[in-house]
Amino acid sequence: MNAAKNTLSIKSIFLDFKEITKAGLAISVLFSSIAGYLLGVNDEHPFKWSVLIVLAIGGYCMVGASNAYNQVIEKDIDSLMDRTKNRPVASGRMSKVTALIVASLLTIIGIVLLYTINAKSAMFAAISIFLYTSIYTPLKTVTSLSVFVGAFPGAIPFMLGWVAATGEFGIEAGTLFLIQFFWQFPHFWSIGWFLYDDYAKAGIFMLPTGNKDRKTALQVILYTIWLIIASLLPVLGYTGQLFISPVAAVLVFLLGLWMLFYAVRLYQLRTPKAARTLMLVSVSYISLLQIVFIVDKFLR
């Protein structure tokens, strides 16, 4: 009987840890860092399994810490929304003190691990955690500009992989940052659209106009176009060692048109279903784009 209780307790702790760090989100973000690392390795900076593993663990800690801090800060807000009311801190399964300890440990472990790769990686991880928890999270209930602020830490992981591989932040890392920066807007605005009512309960501002209207949908289209332009910069030869072939550029452009189609569809329909579809497409888009970049590099 005691063994069964202990097993249940361990399972509950694991599930709460998984939820407070948002494991699914953390792993998807981690994929961006790994993609950036694979794009950054070369003869001068060869691939190393040890670096990749440390980047993966450190990156997970970075994202997990941000998410844990977020759930501590938004305990009362989370309890108001159907989507978040069962989170560990909001539901009372985990105390704020325990969550803060978890977040602090993840912060320390993540930054120390990334520092063993290079100082710049640790610095960008620290900046990401600070921006996400200290500026983006509090702004969510104040202004829709929170999405703009949140786009900065959200765009760091892709770039972080390149910095981990090379130890340098130049035009290449900046381009990867730019791609994921512009991607944040259609992605998060589509989430803010189809979860509009839930966010409204907690007084969270996500949409640029505050409403599910044509002006918001138009901005989704415009940022998707900026995303397409940014994603094609590497084919022009102006982004240093970050380069994609014309064939890869065609694939990247087609992916962009695919996402743009659903952005325009949101403008036409302005329904939660259209917004949710765009959100799902955006998630697939960024992963497929990164895969195209990687495959193209290693096939050349």
UniProtKB/Swiss-Prot annotation:
Location of this chain's protein in the cell: Cell inner membrane
Coiled-coil segments on the chain, per record: none
Membrane topology term: Multi-pass membrane protein
Gene Ontology MF term list: protoheme IX farnesyltransferase activity
CDD domains, sorted: PT_UbiA_Cox10 (cd13957)
Lineage top rank: taxon: Bacteria
Keyword annotations: Cell inner membrane, Cell membrane, Heme biosynthesis, Membrane, Transferase, Transmembrane, Transmembrane helix
Major subcellular site: membrane
Record field: transmembrane: 20-40, 49-69, 97-117, 122-142, 145-165, 176-196, 217-237, 242-262, 278-298
Alphabetized InterPro entries for the sequence: Protohaem_IX_farnesylTrfase, UbiA_prenyltransferase, UbiA_prenylTrfase_CS, UbiA_sf
Presence of keyword Cell membrane: yes
Pfam families: UbiA
EC numbers for this chain: 2.5.1.141
Gene Ontology BP, a term: heme O biosynthetic process
GO-annotated cellular components: plasma membrane
HAMAP family to which the protein is assigned, alphabetical: CyoE_CtaB
Function: Converts heme B (protoheme IX) to heme O by substitution of the vinyl group on carbon 2 of heme B porphyrin ring with a hydroxyethyl farnesyl side group.
Name of the protein in its database record: Protoheme IX farnesyltransferase
